[in-house]
Curated annotation (Swiss-Prot):
GO terms for molecular function: nucleotide binding; RNA-directed RNA polymerase activity. It holds the Pfam family RNA_replicase_B. GO terms for biological process: viral RNA genome replication. It comes from Escherichia phage MS2 (Bacteriophage MS2). This is RNA-directed RNA polymerase beta chain. InterPro entries: DNA/RNA_pol_sf, RNA-dir_Rpol_cat_phage, RNArep_beta. Keywords: Nucleotide-binding, Nucleotidyltransferase, RNA-directed RNA polymerase, Transferase, Viral RNA replication.
Length: 545
């Protein structure tokens, strides 16, 4: 056992109390101005103050876990009911357009039709299982190889397509014959609703899709993703939207639009109105038409929900087409950026884009939509006058060293300009860091919760602890860091067969990771990362922004 680990064993990991409120009060004591990004009196540090505890489970004006879940389910049910009205009666005619809606819809259909031309031979090319737990399976059975190896679930309408893609894969057929798996996949009625944490007021509702539905849906999603990239919309790269948001915060040329519950706003009528008929018919067959909510079966008026394998790509394509059609109609050739419901368009036409979105049943989140001023937010990036002012959140009680070290690193990394941390937070950092033993200081990873980033000593050696964490020994330097991942053993022959089919689906490439060496060593380059510094650590403090 190393000396570092022995020292760790002698430490008290738990703190005497939750420091969350104390941290909030310390930041609030130095914050001035308004935390509302729409206000002329906006300041970044007030924004941090106002956002800090909004995801804390017990502090602030939040709800308990059961209430958060209940509200999320109720919100999903309401959205489903609203889409039912659109499906029966048409789009919201009280949301009139300042130009002919038929012209807009014709343009949208044309854009999407051209984008997706030649789709018939492209929908099955990248079908795959996800790593998530599908309907009818537990999380421990969520790995793709297990879905290939076991009897997969599917809805009745998707069964024919599922059999077609399975019968085109020789290893899959051999597996089914060898292990006497039924050629008729296990039928289920639809998807299942669950919730995940969002903030301290409400959870986020999503759905677990049946195995083969998800497999087919992801093929459609991959196809749309490829086609969108051909028109400059790269759904594999959030940084594009983030850079555009930064540009908009500097010169005001670009607006950022955020929609409220966009994934739960896509009606059946909307997709039917926009997509080529044959493609709509295929997507309609492989989606879930019914969902299980707390044991109750409901019919989905929504075309797809969060958790569906093509929802993200489908909504991105729809928003791209709406923005592009609006651009064309008003003769605007400015830059646009789309990443799901994170929409960026020229500020000049943003009011028209919002008008078109409202016509088709989408509601902007006005708190997070920025058309004027010098604040912009997109894809998790928050910019004010070109400076990253994204707040960090205390999502759980700060009642142990690991939680405290993470907050200390967040304090150092927040609002960095020119390599300098915000000087107003220095005293807060010093006071809180005094509760952390000196052996935990050093390192460069501001996302770490197992040491406190502090100049100038870089962490060099990692040691495993009984708690599964990696501790830094700062007494030595010059070694490269490595993460050790031990291979799992004792896979059954049946599961090995499933793993082979999964490997076959990825192209059958032979890589080093195919070798069974027992362990894998992954080198990192953390020692090259610069450390943000408080001005007080290197001379007289600079003036606050």
């Amino acid at each position: 056992m190393s000396k570092t680990t022995k020292k760790f064993n002698s430490l008290c990991i738990d703190l005497p109390r939750d420091l969350s409120l104390e941290i909030y009060q310390s930041i609030a004591s130095v914050a001035t101005g308004s935390g509302d990004p729409h206000s002329d009196d906006f300041t970044a540090i007030a924004y941090l103050r106002d956002e800090l505890l909004t995801k804390h489970p017990t502090l602030g004006s939040g709800n308990d876990e059961a209430t958060r879940r209940t509200l999320a389910i109720a919100k999903l049910r309401e959205a489903n009911g609203d889409r039912g009205q659109i499906n029966r009666e048409g789009f919201l005619h009280d949301k009139s357009l300042s130009w002919d809606p038929d012209v807009l819809q014709t343009s949208i259909r044309s854009l999407i039709g051209n984008l997706l031309s030649g789709y018939r031979s492209s929908l099955f090319g990248q079908c795959t299982f996800s790593n998530g737990a599908p309907m009818g399976h537990k999380l421990q059975d969520a790995a793709p190889y297990k879905k290939f190896a076991e009897q997969a679930t599917v809805t009745p309408r998707a069964l024919r397509a599922a059999l077609l893609v399975r019968d085109q894969c020789a290893p899959w057929i051999r597996h089914a014959v060898r292990y006497n798996e039924s050629y008729e996949f296990r039928l289920v009625v639809g998807n299942g609703v669950f919730t995940v944490p969002k903030n301290n007021k409400i959870d986020r509702a999503a759905c677990k899709e049946p195995d083969m539905n998800m497999y087919l849906q992801k093929g459609v999603g991959a196809f749309i993703r490829r086609r969108l990239k051909s028109v400059g919309i790269d759904l594999n790269d959030q940084s594009i939207n983030q850079r555009l948001a930064q540009q908009g915060s500097v010169d005001g040329s670009l607006a950022t639009i955020d929609l409220s519950s966009a994934s739960d706003s896509i009606s059946d009528r909307l997709v039917w109105s926009f997509l080529p008929p044959e493609l709509y018919s295929y997507l309609d067959r492989i989606r879930s038409h019914y969902g299980i909510v707390d044991g109750e079966t409901i019919r989905w008026e929504l075309f797809s929900t969060m958790g569906n394998g093509f929802t993200f790509e489908l909504e991105s394509m729809i928003f791209w087409a709406i923005v592009k059609a609006t651009q064309i109609h008003f003769g605007n050739a400015g830059t646009i950026g789309i990443y799901g419901d994170d929409i960026i368009c020229p500020s000049e036409i943003a009011p028209r884009v919002l008008e078109a979105l409202a016509y088709y049943g989408f509601k902007p989140n006005l708190r997070k939509t920025f058309v004027s001023g010098l604040f912009r937010e997109s894809c998790g990036a928050h910019f004010y006058r070109g400076v990253d002012v994204k707040p960090f959140y205390i999502k759980k009680p700060v009642d142990n060293l690991f939680a405290l070290m993470l907050i200390l690193n967040r304090l150092r990394g927040w609002g960095v300009v020119g390599g300098m941390s915000d000087p107003r937070l220095y005293k807060v950092w010093v006071r809180l860091s005094s509760q952390v033993p000196s052996m935990f200081f050093g390192g460069t990873d501001l996302a770490a919760d197992y040491y406190v980033v502090s100049p100038p000593t870089a962490v060099s050696v990692y040691t495993k602890t009984p708690y599964g964490r990696l501790l830094a020994d700062t007494r030595t330097s010059g070694f490269r860091l490595a993460r050790i991942a031990r291979e799992r053993k004792f896979f059954s022959e049946k599961h090995d067969s499933g793993r082979y089919i999964a490997w076959f689906h990825t192209g059958g490439e032979i890589t080093d990771s195919m070798k069974s060496a027992g362990v894998r060593v992954i080198r990192t380059s953390e020692w090259l990362t610069p450390v943000p510094t408080f001005p007080q650590e290197c001379g007289p403090a600079s003036s606050p922004r």
